[in-house]
């Protein structure tokens, strides 16, 4: 019985995430529309609300094409695996339920984000297109660079709360959010989240002027839709993780979802506001600024814990 309940819970979570992704794309198109002083999608149904579902039907009913010289199997598997990973990573969220509150949640998140690099790399390589390969290489270099700082910052918090289980973030933030006492870290984490999800101003994987569309240039119909959904599911997850780490994480509270919506909106807001970085500046930022910052904070937290234990 418990297994059936867990299975139903997993299916519900996946369905809810996919519906959220659909409405996040609609929100993005609306917000970008208003930023550019136009309406955005407003013709389909009431205020354009069914628009993402119409887009999904259109994309999945189009003919599946593939480049003649591409590596057929890996070309098709990489978008599927990409979406699978971005849905699978939701397991580490602290939902106060047996299935979704396991003790190595932080480690599980790092494993899933590291595996996400391979899907981009395989998608770029198997297309057998120079544009796709260059886009894939850029995305891999960028993701690996920023993952180091991401892991160090997460490790700092794990030292602070003393567990890999994400549920401890809730216990430690009952009286005060970590955002208030660690505001610089929150800003750096937000920047790293933007870089990890290949969003503006770090969207070098899909620089239109240089790489046409990046690693997904040869994908059409269903393959493109799966890559697109995986990207937006990871944006939602990174927004939720920001709320868990910095804004307290009582998932049964409506306020939590309002915070999640606001952080997702910030991702879109940044896209509508900032231009793309220069590539050397991106690498400089990752290795010289963020890495030294996160290492200093990690050493500070380790020293802080040692001091606490020596005093006790």
From Swiss-Prot:
The answer to whether UniProt assigns keyword Manganese to this entry is no
User: Any idea of its EC number?
Assistant: 7.1.1.2
Cell compartments where the protein resides: Mitochondrion inner membrane
The record's GO molecular-function terms, alphabetically, read: NADH dehydrogenase (ubiquinone) activity
Q: Which UniProt keywords apply?
A: Electron transport, Membrane, Mitochondrion, Mitochondrion inner membrane, NAD, Respiratory chain, Translocase, Transmembrane, Transmembrane helix, Transport, Ubiquinone
EC top class, as a word: translocase
Check the record and name the InterPro entries matching this protein: NADH_UbQ_OxRdtase_su1/FPO, NADH_UbQ_OxRdtase_su1_CS
Task: State the Gene Ontology BP annotations.
Answer: aerobic respiration; mitochondrial electron transport, NADH to ubiquinone
Q: Which residues form the signal peptide?
A: none
* Family matches, as HAMAP family: NDH1_NuoH
Classification via PANTHER family: NADH DEHYDROGENASE SUBUNIT 1 (PTHR11432), NADH-UBIQUINONE OXIDOREDUCTASE CHAIN 1 (PTHR11432:SF3)
What is the name attached to this protein's record?
NADH-ubiquinone oxidoreductase chain 1
Q: Which organism is it from?
A: Drosophila melanogaster (Fruit fly)
The beginning of the lineage is: Eukaryota, Metazoa, Ecdysozoa, Arthropoda, Hexapoda
């Amino acid at each position: 019985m418990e297994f059936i309940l867990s299975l139903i819970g997993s299916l519900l979570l996946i369905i809810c995430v996919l519906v959220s992704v659909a409405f996040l794309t609609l929100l993005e198109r609306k917000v970008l529309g208003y930023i550019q002083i136009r309406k955005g999608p407003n013709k389909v149904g009431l205020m354009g609300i069914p628009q993402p579902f119409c887009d999904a039907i259109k994309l999945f009913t189009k003919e599946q094409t593939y480049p003649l010289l591409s590596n057929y199997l890996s070309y098709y598997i990489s978008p599927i695996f990409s979406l699978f990973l971005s849905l699978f990573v939701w397991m580490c969220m602290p939902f106060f339920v047996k299935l979704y509150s396991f003790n190595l949640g932080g480690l599980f998140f790092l494993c899933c984000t590291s595996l996400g690099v391979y899907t981009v790399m395989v998608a770029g390589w198997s297309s057998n297109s120079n544009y796709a390969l260059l886009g894939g290489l850029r995305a891999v270099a960028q993701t690996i660079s920023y993952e180091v700082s991401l892991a160090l910052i997460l490790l700092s918090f794990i030292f602070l709360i003393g567990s890999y289980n994400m549920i401890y973030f809730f216990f430690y933030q009952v009286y005060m959010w970590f955002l208030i006492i660690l505001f610089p870290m929150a800003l750096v984490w937000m920047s790293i989240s933007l870089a990890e999800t290949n969003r503006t101003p770090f969207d070098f994987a899909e620089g239109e002027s240089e790489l046409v569309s990046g690693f997904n240039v040869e994908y059409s119909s269903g393959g493109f839709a799966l890559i697109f959904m995986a990207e937006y599911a990871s944006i939602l997850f990174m927004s939720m993780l920001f709320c868990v780490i910095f804004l307290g994480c009582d998932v049964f509270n409506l306020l939590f979802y309002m915070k999640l919506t606001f952080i997702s909106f910030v991702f879109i807001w940044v896209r509508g506001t900032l231009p793309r970085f220069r590539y050397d500046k991106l690498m400089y930022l990752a290795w010289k600024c963020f890495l030294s910052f996160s290492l200093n904070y990690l050493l500070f937290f380790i020293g802080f814990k040692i001091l606490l234990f020596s005093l006790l």
